[in-house]
Amino acid sequence: MDNFFMTWLLPLFIVVGKTLLLLTVLLVLIAYLLYADRKIWAAVQLRRGPNVVGPWGLLQSFADLIKFVVKEPIIPSGANKGVFLLAPFVSATLALSAWAVVPVNEGWEIASINVGLLYILAISSLEVYGVIMGGWASNSKYPFLGALRSAAQMVSYEVSIGFVLVTVILVSGSLDLTTIVQEQNKGLGTYLGLPFSSLLDWNWLILFPMFIIFFISALAETNRPPFDLVEAESELVAGHMVEYSSTPYMLFFLGEYVAIVLMCALTTILFLGGWLPPLDVWWLNWVPGVIWFVLKVCFVFFWFAMVKAFVPRYRYDQLMRLGWKVFLPISLAMVVITAAILKYTSFA
């Protein structure tokens, strides 16, 4: 009995505990990032934004949650009921499951696997199926057009993201996310002999073109403006979510924001040193790594919000052209250049 407890039950309890803790923190973080998103957008437009529910409007996201849950879900008469209801669960579940391998500090992840980057790429590629299912099952032209756009958009930018990840793998020599962060302890700043140079050691500097490509591709991958063509209000009303209401709509919305925060976390891990402090000095090393990680995620999300506020939406043909004719050649060239530098110079 003791052997069964130590071999099976205890590890199971630990995994369940880690999962519940991560989900709780993640959902609370998303609630306040959504609040920040609305506040930033309001500030750019000289409005006040949410300011009624709770002090300074801090409880607005929780009020929205209650509103969505208590509303009546409406299913169109011509919809495929089973697929229609399954689609938002697929979208939200896949978005949440990608977080299983994300380390928010050294050793702080639910599952430590040596191909974590490949796992996240695979899961993020599957998320589009929830959108396609919802668009098709609604039996309406606007959701279906949104689903078709989502599929084409995902294919266009997934290739560029794949090449970006290849360059990071070449530089770090691993698919393990923890190793990728640890390898950023000895980057360009260390190579040049600069003291306290953690900020210059991170991959954003030596892979700057790929950093920009990844950031813009992440906007397209998560359907954020200026690439929100899947749910373009002026063209498709709300895209694949037109016929949804109540909890199913909330699950689509949740999956979208979980994917956005995942891309912010991935940007932090791949290019901004993960949980490493910006300067290698004792008083910054004293700060827990998870705090640095959350601050960097919030910094990346701030730029997601600013792009939404400032940049007008692309036309669909411009979006495709950017993915296939600009990002793909540049990312492919950077893979070749990075491999050549690592092979024929002493930088490796």
Curated annotation (Swiss-Prot):
GO CC terms: plasma membrane
Keyword Acyltransferase (UniProt): no
EC primary class: translocase
EC code(s) of this entry: 7.1.1.-
Keyword Protein biosynthesis: no
Catalyzed reaction equations: a quinone + NADH + 5 H(+)(in) = a quinol + NAD(+) + 4 H(+)(out)
Membrane-spanning ranges: 10-30, 82-102, 115-135, 161-181, 199-219, 251-271, 287-307, 322-342
Keywords: Cell inner membrane, Cell membrane, Membrane, NAD, Quinone, Translocase, Transmembrane, Transmembrane helix, Ubiquinone
Compartments (UniProt record): Cell inner membrane
Top-level taxon: Bacteria
Pfam families: NADHdh
NCBIfam families in alphabetical order: PRK06076.1-2, PRK06076.1-6
Family affiliation: Belongs to the complex I subunit 1 family.
Function of the molecule: NDH-1 shuttles electrons from NADH, via FMN and iron-sulfur (Fe-S) centers, to quinones in the respiratory chain. The immediate electron acceptor for the enzyme in this species is believed to be ubiquinone. Couples the redox reaction to proton translocation (for every two electrons transferred, four hydrogen ions are translocated across the cytoplasmic membrane), and thus conserves the redox energy in a proton gradient. This subunit may bind ubiquinone.
Name of the protein this chain belongs to: NADH-quinone oxidoreductase subunit H
Species of provenance: Bartonella bacilliformis (strain ATCC 35685 / KC583 / Herrer 020/F12,63)
The encoding gene: nuoH
